[in-house]
């Protein structure tokens, strides 16, 4: 039996705006409008404005999505540049190959896609974009832990599978960095495939205070003679800052490093980290093949023989839960990070 269904049939607001009813919270039955008050601006909102501004200056910029214009923040781009907006439907593989084709003809395509859906197009990323070194930018939304959307929407794989290709990968930790690095990635400074990833929701207030220096990495905390450094990227940095404060209260001095360029590493970053005896690297990413694994190898190749603590996702099946709950379950909350450092310090003292 072949049954043809129609999304939203029988309910006017859903038929008129099917993308809004893909997943819903409480809403008014008569109007279809959400009952919840409008939330603060998100990374997606800021990306939406930034890509429109950049497209005004560069006529070669085109935006591609796979049936997610609303979720990826491209509705504004679609209205402003209809001739440069392409929704290919639920066909992520085609989105990537289409982008490669446009790039081969001198355009600058930006593939706007959720991290979890980017997985569907990995073959095309390798063969059609990466091997040919096509000038394609990947804007990866919903990166890292994703609340509410469930187990299948966790953005925990893209750092691992993109770093295998040597693709430049950036992860802003606030809106200023998002705007700056998106501008850089769409400039002549880069050529070939590259990616920027950002989480669902808004920026962390504490991370926003650090602004954007334009550097590949920064120290958020620096103390004299520290032998321990905590390293991470994106939202996980907020937990590192909390862990650093708690460790300071326990008389354990730590520096905190923020990575913006996740891969490939710069020689200077590896050299700076080689000065420490204990390095804790935390990330909302699957452990195998992750940025942390690459970094540990790079340090060892540089002759470093200190203690490397890698806090990452060890179980690929994450629960449907809030970000705080997922971090607690995976050992990526501040309490677990503090415990990991304390254990490493104690072990080191026992070896003396």
Model-derived features: positions:
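Thiamine diphosphate
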Residues: 2-23, 32-79, 87, 93-97, ...
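Glycine-rich phosphate/pyrophosphate-binding loops
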Residues: 107-117, 136
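Acidic/polar residues at beta-strand termini and the immediately following turn/coil
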Residues: 28-30
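Acidic (Asp/Glu)-rich catalytic clusters
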Residues: 106, 128-130
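Conserved glycine-bearing catalytic or ligand-binding loops at nucleotide- and phosphate-handling centers
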Residues: 171-189
